[in-house]
């Protein structure tokens, strides 16, 4: 079973009711054993426009709301 939520950092809030969240994942390279950090960007729905750049937020998957928006904001963990 997969996790019900993901934690990331808000990198953009210029769209109305939409935030862009960067989620970092760390994995070890199979051959060279180096830790690699991969960053995924997700568009998330922010109903009340309450998030600002730099906030740490919790998001979860949701039904498609637009062409690219498939995540919804659960809560702000750390406010900047």
UniProtKB/Swiss-Prot annotation:
Primary location recorded for the protein, binned into one broad class: plastid
Localization, UniProt: Plastid, Chloroplast
Transmembrane regions listed in the UniProt entry: none
The entry's keywords: Chloroplast, Plastid, Ribonucleoprotein, Ribosomal protein, RNA-binding, rRNA-binding
Gene Ontology biological process terms from the UniProt entry: translation
UniProt keyword annotation of RNA-binding present: yes
HAMAP family: Ribosomal_uS17_B
Homology family: Belongs to the universal ribosomal protein uS17 family.
Protein name, UniProt field: Small ribosomal subunit protein uS17c
Organism: Gracilaria tenuistipitata var. liui
Taxonomic placement: Eukaryota, Rhodophyta, Florideophyceae, Rhodymeniophycidae, Gracilariales
Gene: rps17
